[in-house]
Amino acid sequence: DIVGYLQNFTLDETIGGQVYRVTRPQNSGKGTLRGAEFGIQKFFDFLPGPWSGFGAQFNYTWIDGDNESKTGFDSDEFTTTALVGVARQNYNVALLYEGNGITGRLAATRRGDYVEQIAEPPFDQDRVVKATTFVDLSIGYELNPRVSLQFDAINLTRAKFQSSLGPYQPRDIRYNPTTYGVSLRFKM
């Protein structure tokens, strides 16, 4: 059970005769949260030579819940809503490598649809973020016991961020580029 889940609330509010759209955090009422998680990781150390460094990782999370959200800033009335920022289904699958001073990880992470904002004005509909899958790559090489080199590529598939008001009315689409990074690490 959940009591007082903190969530942002947006409402058009009149201040000094002028209407402003105000967003601020507030405690919600009671809610419920239930779910299950499954994960497994296995290295294929039964394979010969450098192949023994390969492995795989998988995890899956299922969450269901609801929450009582206030119907207005100063209201004592509540309505049952989804939990803000909580996707019902999420999973991660990765191919791993560790051996001969090399580490690598190619991973796909999927986050399901989730509600980002309850009853967004002026349409009074929930803002829903659409499911997205990100694919990332990380490769490291140990030059010697004290120095290692790391390469990262985030969002290889250039997955986009998409939100809508209610289930169908597009609100926001952002095209996210692939981000690359290189680092050199020293151990003292």
What are these language model-derived features?
Residues 1-3, 54, 110-119, 140-188:
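C-terminal beta-signal and adjacent terminal beta-strands/loops
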Residues 15-118, 157:
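Gram-negative outer-membrane beta-barrel transporters
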Residues 28-29, 79-83, 123-129, 170-171:
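Short, contiguous acidic/charged loop-to-helix segments that flank catalytic cores in large enzymes
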Residues 8, 68, 159-162:
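Active-site-proximal flexible loops/turns
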Residues 4-10:
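A surface-exposed, glycine/aromatic-enriched loop/edge motif typical of exported proteins
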Residues 133-136, 150:
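Outer membrane beta-barrel transmembrane domains
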Residues 88, 130-132:
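Short solvent-exposed loop/turn micro-motifs enriched in small/polar/acidic residues
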